[in-house]
Each structure stands twice: as structure tokens, then as C-alpha cells.
Amino acid sequence: MPEEALLKLYDEHHRLKLTIDPAAVVYVAADSNYINVHYLENGREKVFPVRNSMKSFEEAARRHGIVRCHRSFYVNPKHIRLLSRGKDGIIYTLFNVDEMGKVPVSKMYYDELARLL
């Protein structure tokens, strides 16, 4: 895979922390001062924490087709099986890999995400 096609994640001091095929990324979650990258490696879920903000991840996400679905989450639409409304009324993503859990989708981002599926 060409170097420019890889997703490169830097920490808050601009040090390279993770280089990954963007197709392997399932979702990214905010956790205090970290972003947790949930990705697949050999069919299994891995999580890699990077000390940085969602705002700083935004440009890299856009370049690689990873979209925001909530103030605390980005998702890769290629891994989404469907969008489902829970009993609590919240819309969630369900992924192709069941072990990945589910991620909330806010009303603000729903239309864009639904259009990509």
C-alpha cells in the first residue's frame, strides 16, 4: 500500500504514534484527553489509544473516508451493517463484526451517515 494511502495518527506533540490501513479502522472514540482507535487485525478487535483530541483527528478522518457520527465518535461506514434505534430512542450503528459493540449516532450526523450506507 502506498505510504500516502495510510492513516497516520500523531499525538499532541506531533509525534507519529500509529500508521494503519484506514480500511482496518472501525471507529474512533474520544476518552478524556485520548482518542481510542478501534481497528481489526487478523479479524480481531484491537484498541490503540493516542493522546490527542477529536478535533485534531478530523482532517485525517475526512481524507480517509472516516466520518463523524457523534461528538465523541467517528466511524468507518465500510464496517457498518445497519443503523438501529434502541429502546432508549437513541440511534446506534451495528458493525459487521458483532464483537465491536455499537456506537451512538446523533441526529446532527444521521442523514450524512445514512446517505453513505
Task: List the predicted regions and their residue ranges.
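Basic, polyanion-interacting recognition surfaces, primarily
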Residues: 1-117
